[in-house]
Amino acid sequence: MPFALYTRCMGLSLYAATTSQGKLRDFAAAAAAHSIEVASLPRLGKIPAPEENGATFAANATLKAVYYSRYAPGALVLADDSGLEVDALDDAPGVRSARFAADAGLTDSPDANDNTDVWNNMVLLQRMAGVHPAQRTARYRCVLVAARDGQPLYTAEGAVEGLILDAPRGTGGFGYDPLFYLPDLDRTMAELDLETKHGLSHRGRAFAALLAQMKI
């Protein structure tokens, strides 16, 4: 079910096309920095998800924004596509970040659907086994697209550089956060509080860039 971000002072509604609770928390933190409230909109009901078959983050974010905007006439619909790019893996998992374990054939496991992050991290660790610490460079990348009535209007991108650890650290965040290490902070993404994470994360940077384009 999509979620809405809206600012009362401008009378603007943004529908964020995501059911990811982790992404919703990130958006909430980003929105709070701009005095924007985040709320769910159950009146939209359940909308069937489109097939994410784009080859890039921008392509997937655009197709989702355009698709969901047709269900909310007149409103701006915000879609995110993001993931992890690991240099030693030729930028994999990339657009397949959420399905890394599934692509490795782990969907037959009875726990795969309930522990997707755990399985994805396990596959990443397996693929990175034996890679020298200096060669474990990676980045989180996010592309946000806002569309109205089937037309994309704004596109913004954010990225943050880091390293992939050989074991998880921290209990916060989601996705690959326990393995994504920030050398300047000596912390993983999973060890950061939400406010700090928003200030430097790929999604926070993309969100700030999008709002700047929209002059919010």
What is each stretch, according to the model?
Residues 11-15, 21-216:
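Anionic-ligand binding patches
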